[in-house]
From Swiss-Prot:
Binding partners and assembly: Monomer.
Subcellular localization: Secreted
Function comment: Thrombin-like snake venom serine protease, that cleaves both alpha-chain (FGA) and beta-chain (FGB) of fibrinogen. Partially degrades factor X (F10), and release bradykinin from kininogen (KNG). Potently induces platelet aggregation. Shows a proteolytic activity towards protein constituents of the platelets cytoskeleton. Hydrolyzes actin, actin-binding protein, and P235. Shows a preferential cleavage at Arg-|-Xaa bonds.
Any one Gene Ontology molecular-function term assigned to this protein's record: toxin activity
GO biological process terms, semicolon-separated: proteolysis
EC numbers for this chain: 3.4.21.-
Temperature dependence: Optimum temperature is 45 degrees Celsius.
Regulation of this protein's activity per its record: Inhibited by diisopropylfluorophosphate (DFP).
Assigned protein family: Belongs to the peptidase S1 family. Snake venom subfamily.
Protein's name according to its UniProt entry: Thrombin-like enzyme cerastobin
Protein species of origin: Cerastes vipera (Sahara sand viper)
pH dependence: Optimum pH is 7.9.
Primary location class: secreted
């Protein structure tokens, strides 16, 4: 995680922001996890 900040585990559970480029890919594992 680049530029992340700590927060309570129950805060913002559904917010995900992805910056995509041709060098990286993202996979949605389930409704709570992005790899």
């Amino acid at each position: 995680v680049i530029g992340g900040a700590k927060c309570n585990i129950n805060e913002h559970r559904s917010i995900v922001l992805l910056y995509s480029s041709r060098l990286f890919g993202h996979t949605l594992i389930n409704k709570e996890w992005v790899l």
